[in-house]
């Protein structure tokens, strides 16, 4: 119940933090200014016997790498590759990244390697969705996990030793074109779509620059006219994105995670009049085995019988009443007085939703 009170207190205080205005750059993004995902395949070498077991796929990759270095491995020789591991590499290419700049990469084992700790990623290409190479990755891995295994099969694993990271491990080789400097307009897309917030954003821009400069297209997008000159457009956008907007109040929602028992109730939730009674039913089944011994010299056999005892205990349900316009605070206070556990509160909320007593949306994760 302490956790339930904590969640309720946090939700009650949340609107106080949102009462002040937010910068446009904090609640929206510029259309076309986005990161791009890169992916690649490579080999990590230098592992202390924790690499890949011998298989045709890894062996072929290893032979291809040596061939690229001008080393021909005879077909009748099977290389030992316990210190090598095939890996998948992925990274995010930031917007406006230029050739020569570096980005972080994440390296993950894709075979049977036990750990990448102490390994070094050899030069690997990172490609975009179009199949073109945008960066080249190489470097020593930093692995936060640790794994150890004994000769008897016992092992200890801490965190994830098969995933590592290389800070500034990839060099950008190609710039991704974008449409930022094209056209007469810039479009801001709200992180959380809302018609009221979109209108307010357009009003703030129009108040500063002039009427009809900004127009809300829908609940997400706001179109703003901007200079064509790249230098002027950057200065213009720097001014616009630092303007402050009062975001609209969030829609009334109750979020329930049935797997973890977490319940978050928004402060905008209102309840219609309702009377609620919730009682618990406990069923206990006990199994006892009884042994029956035959009389001496009777020729009988020992018999084992099961004796089951079933006990049903029903807790006395208490009823509480919610008046018109009851708020989050009223609901939490009522369930705390009754002693409802978070698991039971989920059932109560679902029942209230079915009865039409919740003025808001119930979202079950």
Curated annotation (Swiss-Prot):
The keyword Signal applies. Its main location: periplasm. GO terms for cellular component: bacterial-type flagellum basal body, distal rod, P ring; outer membrane-bounded periplasmic space. One of its GO terms (molecular function) is structural molecule activity. InterPro entries: Flag_FlgI (IPR001782). HAMAP family: FlgI (MF_00416). Assembles around the rod to form the L-ring and probably protects the motor/basal body from shearing forces during rotation. NCBIfam families: PRK05303.1. The basal body constitutes a major portion of the flagellar organelle and consists of four rings (L,P,S, and M) mounted on a central rod. This is Flagellar P-ring protein.
């Amino acid at each position: 119940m302490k956790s339930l009170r904590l969640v309720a207190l946090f939700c009650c205080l949340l609107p106080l933090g949102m009462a002040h205005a937010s910068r446009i750059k904090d609640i929206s993004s510029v259309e076309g200014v986005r990161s791009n995902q890169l992916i690649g395949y490579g080999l990590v070498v230098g592992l202390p016997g924790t690499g890949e077991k011998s298989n045709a796929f890894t062996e072929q990759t290893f032979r291809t790498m040596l061939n690229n270095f001008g080393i021909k491995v005879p077909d009748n020789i099977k290389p030992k590759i316990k210190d090598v591991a095939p890996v998948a590499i992925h990274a995010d290419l930031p917007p406006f990244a230029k050739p020569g700049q570096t980005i972080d990469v994440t390296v993950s084992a894709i075979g049977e390697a036990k750990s990448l700790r102490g390994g070094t990623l050899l030069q690997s290409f990172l490609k975009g969705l179009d199949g073109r190479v945008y960066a080249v990755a190489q470097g020593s891995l930093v692995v936060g996990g640790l794994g150890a295994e004994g000769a008897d099969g016992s092992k200890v694993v801490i965190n994830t030793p098969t995933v590592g990271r290389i800070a500034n491990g990839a060099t950008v080789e190609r710039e991704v074109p974008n449409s930022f400097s094209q056209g007469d307009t810039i479009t801001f897309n709200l992180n959380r779509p809302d018609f009221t917030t979109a209108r307010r954003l357009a009003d703030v821009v129009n108040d500063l620059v002039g009427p009809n400069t900004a127009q809300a297209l829908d609940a997400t997008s706001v179109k703003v006219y901007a200079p064509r000159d790249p230098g002027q457009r950057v200065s213009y956008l720097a001014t616009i994105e630092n303007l402050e907007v009062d975001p609209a109040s969030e829609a009334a929602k109750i979020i329930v995670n049935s797997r973890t028992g977490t319940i978050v109730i928004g402060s905008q939730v209102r309840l219609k009049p309702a009377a609620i009674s919730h009682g618990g039913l406990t069923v206990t089944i006990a199994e006892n085995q009884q042994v029956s011994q035959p009389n001496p010299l009777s020729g009988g056999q020992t018999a084992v019988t099961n004796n089951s005892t079933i006990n049903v205990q029903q807790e006395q349900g208490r009823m509480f009443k919610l008046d018109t316009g009851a708020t989050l605070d009223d609901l939490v206070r009522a369930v705390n007085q009754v002693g409802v556990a978070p698991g039971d509160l989920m059932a109560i909320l679902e029942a209230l939703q079915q009865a039409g007593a919740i003025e808001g949306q119930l979202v079950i994760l």
